[in-house]
């Protein structure tokens, strides 16, 4: 089943800094966190954990 739409929550794309083009989609509440997301996650293209940074989601 699909997730329920949260009020005030927005969908964002976090892109690998390795330049592979791999990305994750993240839903976050803008009222709680104003700063941009950046965290380490697994990039299957380079097969290691790398830093991912927030980017705009093109609709």
Curated annotation (Swiss-Prot):
<protein>
    <recommendedName>
        <fullName>Large ribosomal subunit protein bL33</fullName>
    </recommendedName>
</protein>
<comment type="similarity">
    <text>Belongs to the bacterial ribosomal protein bL33 family.</text>
</comment>
<dbReference type="GO" id="GO:0015934">
    <property type="term" value="C:large ribosomal subunit"/>
</dbReference>
<dbReference type="InterPro" id="IPR011332">
    <property type="entry name" value="Ribosomal_zn-bd"/>
</dbReference>
<keyword id="KW-0689">Ribosomal protein</keyword>
<dbReference type="GO" id="GO:0003735">
    <property type="term" value="F:structural constituent of ribosome"/>
</dbReference>
<dbReference type="Pfam" id="PF00471">
    <property type="entry name" value="Ribosomal_L33"/>
</dbReference>
<dbReference type="InterPro" id="IPR038584">
    <property type="entry name" value="Ribosomal_bL33_sf"/>
</dbReference>
<keyword id="KW-0687">Ribonucleoprotein</keyword>
<dbReference type="InterPro" id="IPR001705">
    <property type="entry name" value="Ribosomal_bL33"/>
</dbReference>
<dbReference type="GO" id="GO:0005737">
    <property type="term" value="C:cytoplasm"/>
</dbReference>
<dbReference type="GO" id="GO:0006412">
    <property type="term" value="P:translation"/>
</dbReference>
């Amino acid at each position: 089943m699909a997730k329920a739409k949260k009020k005030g929550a927005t969908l964002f794309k976090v892109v690998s800094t390795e330049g592979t083009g791999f990305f994750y989609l993240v839903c976050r509440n803008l009222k709680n966190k104003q700063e941009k997301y950046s965290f380490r996650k697994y990039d299957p293209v380079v097969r290691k954990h790398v830093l991912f940074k927030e980017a705009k989601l093109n609709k």
